[in-house]
Amino acid sequence: MGDVAQRIRVTGVVQGVGFRPFVWHLAQELSLSGWVRNDALGVDILAQGADEQVQALIARLRSEAPPLARVEAVEAATTTPSAHCSGFAIAPSVDGAVATAIGVDVGVCPDCLGELFNPNGRRWRHAFITCTHCGPRFTVTTGLPYDRSRTTLAPFALCPDCQAEHPHAADRRFHAAPTCC
């Protein structure tokens, strides 16, 4: 049987909470192609692959969201599969009339606390430690969709080490907008 494609809309508190990296990881696990991006309504996903795998993605978006996310709705619509769709990417955000919410600031998570007090780590005693699971969201956001370019951190370039973490899928700071050093 051939591939199917679904356009999936996720609404709620789904920006600034590690939702795009979460979707990316699920897509890799399920061998799906397509993309995920933030937009003015929440998160927009194109998922293409075996029907069983696409349906598994939709179910898991509802049941396994990141801890800071609050999924209000997951809506899917069938679309035409593309022969040119390969791999799964975090696509650039799309602007529009804002109808989504941003998460609240969250205290430091246990993993970041471990780094904060590790004298051998590069984030030892770093006052602005954060990852996709903790740190500032609301107080640094200047606009939506939520991306680093729409935070108060936008004028500050990432150092080479932080820049290397940002696109690295296995890292807690994968696409974490408030990362800084």
Spans of features found by a protein language model:
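Intrinsically disordered, low-complexity, mixed-charge
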Residues: 1-179
